[in-house]
Amino acid sequence: MKSNVEKFDEITGHIFAHLYLNFPVEMNFDYSRWGCEVDEDYWSDPNSDESRRKQRERDIIDATFRFLERSGYIIYTPTNGGYMNVTLTEKALLSLKRHPDSLTGSKTFGDVIAEAFKAGAQEKMKGAVGTVMTMAFSSITGGSL
């Protein structure tokens, strides 16, 4: 079972990949992207194991969106089934447009995250997301963690 931090990194990678590839167009994200939409099964038996699993996933997705907004990475409008008008902030775009020190060539963090997402390379995507978040935090704190 994945930890909440691993799920956060995957969800963040998914969000960043879509927003970076489509920037500046605002995107909509609903829970069905993660297989945890509220459907007829939920309403017929909200206490079933599957309904509870989907609710836990929605809680993590909601917390991820709130964290990314509060941290200044995204702007969005919440809806009952997800989020609409989601876009990257200037801070996020600048972070995603940076080039990793470990890479030679012209790929940016955004490119790495988007390519890893498309290829299903979860570990590579999570690593790039973690680096982007650390880099942005370090720039705010003057490089000290």
Placement of each model-derived feature along the sequence:
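Short, surface-exposed loop/turn segments at secondary-structure junctions
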Residues: 2, 78-83
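Short amphipathic alpha-helical interface segments
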Residues: 4-52, 59
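Short amphipathic alpha-helical interaction segments
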Residues: 51-70
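Short, amphipathic alpha-helical interaction segments positioned at domain boundaries
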Residues: 83-116
